[in-house]
Structures are given as C-alpha cells and as structure tokens.
Amino acid sequence: MAKAIPRVGSRKNGRISSRKSARRIPKGVIHVQASFHNTIVTVTDVRGRVVSWSSAGTCGFRGTRRGTPFAAQTAAANAIRTVVDQGMQRAEVMIKGPGLGRDAALRAIRRSGIVLTFVRDVTPMPHNGCRPPKKRRV
C-alpha cells in the first residue's frame, strides 16, 4: 500500500499561522454594499478572493443603528485595518446600494491612507423589473 501524502496545512505538520495573514496584497478591490438596514464592506484581491470583511452588525451595532452612517464608517475602518497591515497600498472601490452608509464608508476608506484608483457605483438598476414596495403612510 502506498504511503499517505501529508496534507499541507494540517495540524500534524506543525503549521499554525493562517494562510491569509501570510499573503501580501499590494492592490485590491473594496466592495461596499449599503442597504437601508446594514452596510457590508468586503475587501478582495484583484482576482476576487476575499481578504477581509466587516459589517455594521459584526461591529456591535444592532437594530436600526446598523443602518446609520456612523455604523458604516466603523465597519469600513474595521475591514480596512487588517488589509493595511498586509501591505495594501492601492484599491478600487465598488459601491452598491441606496443606503445611508455609502458616503460615510467612502470617507472612512479615503481616511485610511489607501490610494484609490477609481470609485464606481455598481448599484443594480431595474429596466422596469419587480414592482417596488408601496409608499409609507405615516
């Protein structure tokens, strides 16, 4: 019977550090999804593999406070803090959604020191697709 090949990254090999922290990422893509109820910030490399992510909910905001601009700013700062440590210097920003956290997240990204190559709005616009929700009567 053939000898089993040890798997890379198994605990028997004694490899403790994670693979994600070892990667150096000079350029990446920052995706900001701002809905009315939450803001999710995902940082990927150029090929689309997720390096870091954060949301207003994971930052400790609950209920209606998750949709606030301050929560979006905190989520963006948390997601970017880890990738700056990994050496990210340039990034593209893709913003999606109509939420309040769009501008606040972009402000936090600009303040982080990463050079932004471009900022693109990728909000999906329907060509008269689904019927929108009814208007609120307060």
From Swiss-Prot:
Cell compartment(s), UniProt: Plastid, Chloroplast
Pfam families reported for this sequence: Ribosomal_S11
Alphabetical keyword list: Chloroplast, Plastid, Ribonucleoprotein, Ribosomal protein, RNA-binding, rRNA-binding
One cellular component (GO) term of this entry: chloroplast
Start and end residues of each stretch annotated as Disordered: 1-23
Keyword set includes rRNA-binding: yes
Keyword Transmembrane applies: no
PANTHER family hit by this protein: 40S RIBOSOMAL PROTEIN S14/30S RIBOSOMAL PROTEIN S11 (PTHR11759)
Name of the protein described by the UniProt record: Small ribosomal subunit protein uS11c
